[in-house]
Amino acid sequence: MSANIFSEGQKISARGEDFLISKVDTNYDGSFLLYAQGISELVKGKSFVFDTNIDNEISTVDPTRTRLIADIDSGYRKTKLFIETQVRNSFIYSEKITIAPKAAFNLAEYQLTPTLKALKLPRPRILIADGVGLGKTIEAGIFLVEMMKRGKGKRIMVLALKSILAQFQQEMWNRFAIPLVRLDSEGISRIKTKLPTNKNPFEYYDKTIISIDTLKNNAKFRHYIEKSHWDIIVIDECHTVANEESQRGDLAQFLSQQCDALVLTSATPHNGRKESFANIIRMIEPTAIPRSGDYCKADIEDYYVRRFKNDIEDASVRANFRDREIVRLGTQLTEDEIDFLQYQQNLKFNALAGIRQGKTQNDYLFSIGIFKAFLSSPKAALASINSRIEKVKTALSASDDLGDNLSILIELKSKLENILSKNADSKYHKLKETLIELGWSGRLHDDRFVLFAERIDTIKYLKENLQTDFNLPDESIAYFHGSLSDVEQEDMIDDFGKKDSRVRIMICSDAASQGVNLHFFCNRMINYDIPWSLITLEQRNGRIDRYGQYKTPYIYYLVAESDIPGLKTDLHIIERLTHKEEEAHKSLGDAGSVMRLYNQKKEEQFVVNAIKKQDEGFLEKHDGYEFDFSVLFGNDSDKTLPLITDQPYETPLSIYPQDDLFYRDLFEQLISSGQVSGSELKENSPGYIELMNTPELNEVLFDLPPEALPRINDIFRLTSDKELVQKAIEEARKRGGEWAKFQVLYELHPAIRYYMSKLEASVDKDIALAARSAVFPAATAWFILHGQVSNDLGQPVISDFFVIGVKWDGSLVQSLFYSMSS
């Protein structure tokens, strides 16, 4: 074939199917490599490479050979449908919101800002750093569907914490009809049975969701991603990858180079160090940070959004947030607890005296460690002491540290065992008393509670005692911690979010404090112990105090009380954290900006030092820290505005006044032409359609989540009524293991795309439908053309429809082209 007949943007036919050339490379022998996107029914949406030296039957689609065939349908229905389908399947170029309003969520304009901001950038990349509970997952979904509508969201990978893979996957499907294949341990096992050993799952499945730890720890997956490229990568809770020297950070930096668009989300996007935050910004835009590493707000403001609840001005949106109620449950320590803590205080004072004499801090840190463990529970403190005793017994030699003094450890152990044997745990008694006062007995109609505790030993201790004291079956209390497998975590979170769950109390470690939705059917949370980090405390409280909580969130703190000097101060320092978190919640919106350390471990150390100095005013002092990020994010002048344009929406081109009319005509046409049988499709009412999952459709939709795909001969229920879809989501939460029965009816739904491609296929590529209309001037013909220019990846950068009027003599009407979109 001649060398000059192939060019980018050209349509070709090969092996009986049609393709659009996105790139042309010259082979060593003068032949060509044609990179192409499939556009006919069987290959639509897939990428191919043709070697003209091998495929010598490639022909170009010649528009001059097009035959005009009269549309004889009533009202030219087929012509209208063909034009509308072409328009809906085409990609648009716009800096405004076009398709997201059709998805199933309550639209709040502040949620549009990340996408609007990203669309203005040469590469759409954005950090969504909104505060806890503002709906960052919805904001990410808006970005994804808008990019898909622009032809830049075919291949998507989402990285999330293993505990929320299923939660994120459901949100994307239920609200946006984005099918993400979940690659947790169960999903990986499933695809191993489907794919050959050497098959790259990221090439087989276009849209996936996986834990970054799975990628990090699986050498084969690392090999796969090195050979893959994505249109969009989403990294949820991106603060976990901020350290580029860690395995996670190194992997995230690599992945940021394997995609075009990038979305990072985190309510705590930095740890207070400029270098750490610069690592995140460099993933978004490497040139944003000056080479010197010294940057300011002006350098990075295009690449992030950050708002808090207090910044949301729309009253209708604020109504989705309920004002929380704080309940402090003071617990008077028992004599046995006081005896233990006085012993601990003596150890602390002796250690402080030793520090003044030049000794190390080891003894002080040991005394604080057992204090912190005891504030979680006597059981947790006993587990720590027992572990220490075993280490000392097996050590070849002991040091002079208190923690290595066997007699001290045995004395501590004896006092803790005494507390437990006498059932003298005042905090547990207060918890039990509070539950009884609230009328709670663990029955199915009783309120659900989330309990947070730092130590796994405390979690197990609480489960055992609550089950015994309330005579509860094992299924009534669940406990969640980081040692559970990804599937166990997903199943537990999913079950607790269902109305028919039998779990009445879910006891969680801080592994559940990030990103997990626990507010469905639960509005009561108890901090059984108080974390020594405001960031952790804020994240805990945000599990039930978040967007979409329809009841008043009740947050309980169990606070130990004592009048013993020294101990009283230590306990008051810990209690001050709860007051300061509440102050920050009401005013700043960001608890991390109080200490300005932006790192849980650093905040815990800050509290340790406050106890050492007996400084009850430690939370009022902020001087001397390296990087005051509140200057960047906290002040009014730095906050992202709810909208960055007065008119954020652009209505997509359509020749149908309502979507419902288009879908009605589409399915009537497919049935009347015999392309599908009447039993496959059923329009129950305007905007509500039932589609049977036929063997053919099931094969096309192979990459849908198994939970979302009906069995063969069962039905999809699609509706344009967003309220109905949202009710279906709520109904699904009432029953374990179910996804929403209704799905959103719009052109991005995979099943709808399949039926629109069938309509397109009903008109041969060398045919153009012709229709008569009295609205056009006499002796003229008007042609509708679609023009598209793509980049090297096959992504459209220009796409528009034009109407060209031609007179009988061949001249243009007024020599003008009319853009349909304008």
Residue ranges and their predicted role:
Residues 41-116, 120-124, 136-139, 145-248, ...:
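SF2 helicase/translocase NTPase motor core
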Residues 74-78, 84, 92, 551-742, ...:
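C-terminal accessory region of SF2 helicases/translocases
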Residues 197-198, 203-204, 209-230, 241, ...:
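Inter-lobe coupling linker of SF2 helicases/translocases
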Residues 218, 272-273, 507-522, 541-549:
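SF2 helicase motor core recognition
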Residues 229, 276-279, 516-529, 554-557:
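A short beta-strand element within the Helicase C-terminal
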Residues 321-332, 369-505:
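Conserved Helicase C-terminal RecA-like lobe
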Residues 350, 696-822:
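Mid-to-C-terminal oligomerization/interaction "stalk" domains of large proteins
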Residues 533-555:
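Conserved SF2 helicase motif VI
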